[in-house]
Amino acid sequence: MGDMNTTGVSAIGIANIAMDGTVLDTWYPHPELSTDDAHQWRDIGEPGTVRLGAHDLSPRMLSLVRLDEDRMVEQVAVRTTIADLSQPPIDAHDVYLRLHLLSHRLVRPHELNMEGVYQKLTTVVWTNKGPCLPDNFEFVRTSLRSRGLIHVYGIDHLPRMVDYVVPTGVRIAEAERVRLGAYLASGTEVLREGFVSYNAGTLGPATVEGCLYSGVTVGEGAVLQHDSSVVSNALSNGDRPALHVGASTVLGVNSTLMEVSLGDNCLLGPNLLIEPDTTLYFADDDRLAPATTIAGEDGWSIVHEPGNVEPVARKVANTTSTGSSGQSNQGSRSSRRAKAEPTTTEAKEPRTKKTRARKTTKRTRR
C-alpha cells in the first residue's frame, strides 16, 4: 500500500435527499482524480458540494432529477469537490465520493482519509425502489406498494457496492456481502459466504470465502477459506488501522486473525484464533513467543499439532497456495516433521504443560 493520496477529485452525482434535508446517498457514475493543473481547480470551484442546474447536466443525468413523492425524497444533481484526499471527509456527499473512488479502483484502501465515516452517514432503509428514511418507512411502504412489491435489502449506514459500482473482472456470489467502498482487484472471487467491507479488499486476484473487515487488505493469490476472518479492531473514533495479509497466504476454515498482519506465503491452520498476545510455540528453536514476533513476516506456517498446547509456528520455504484445501501444505509439513524425528530409540516427549514445567525446573537447577 502506498502513502496517503494528496490528489483532489471532482464528480457530478445524483443525491437522494429526504424532506428533512438528510442526505441518504449520492451516486457518482464517473469520478475522476484531478491533475495538478491550477486552472482545473478554478473551473471546478471551491471544495464542497453544490447543487447543479439543468445547464450543467447531460440529458441522461437531467432525466434523473425529480421529486419522488412516494419515498418522500428529492433526487438532486450535485457536484462534489475534494481538494485533498488526505484530509478527512466533511459531509455525507464527501464520504460517498471517497467510497466510489475505492470501488472504482481509482485509489487503494488507506490511500485516502476515511476518518469518522460513520459519523457523517445516517441509517438508511435500502430498498429496490431507492433509499428511504427508517422513521417513516411504514407510511412510505404503503405509498410504494402501488409500484409493485417492496424488497428491503438492509437497514444500515452503507449500501451494497453493486448498486453503485460493478468493477470489471470480479465474481460476487451474493451482492449483500460486499459493501460500497470495497476494493476488489480484477480476478477476485467473493464466494457465497465471503464478505468485504469498505476501505478493505484485495490488491490482486484472490479468493474470499471469509470476512475482510474494514481496514484489511489481502495480496495476490490469497485464499480465505470458509468462515475465516481478518479483523482490524476499531479505535475509539470508529476508525480501523491498516492490516495486511500477504500474497499466496491461506487462512484455514474457521480461523481468525485479529490485529496481526501476515506476510507472503503463510498458512494459518483451521480453527485458530491469533491475536497479538497469542502465545506461539516456535518448533524450530523450541521457544515460546507472542504472535507479534512474526507480524508481517513471510513464510510461516501456524497450525495445531497433537501434543502441543499452543499453536505451532514453523518457518517454511517456497510455500504456495494450491487451492482452498491446502493439502499440499499439510503434506510438506508432515514430511518436515518426519525428517525431524529423533534417530535414537528415545522417543521425543510431547510438549504438554507438565513437560514444559520439568524443562523449566532443569534449566533453573543449572
Predicted segments, located by residue:
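Glycine-rich adenosyl-nucleotide cofactor-binding module
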Residues: R141-R192, V196-S197, T202-L203
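Terminal amphipathic alpha-helical/low-complexity segments used for targeting or macromolecular assembly
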Residues: M1-D163, T293-R366
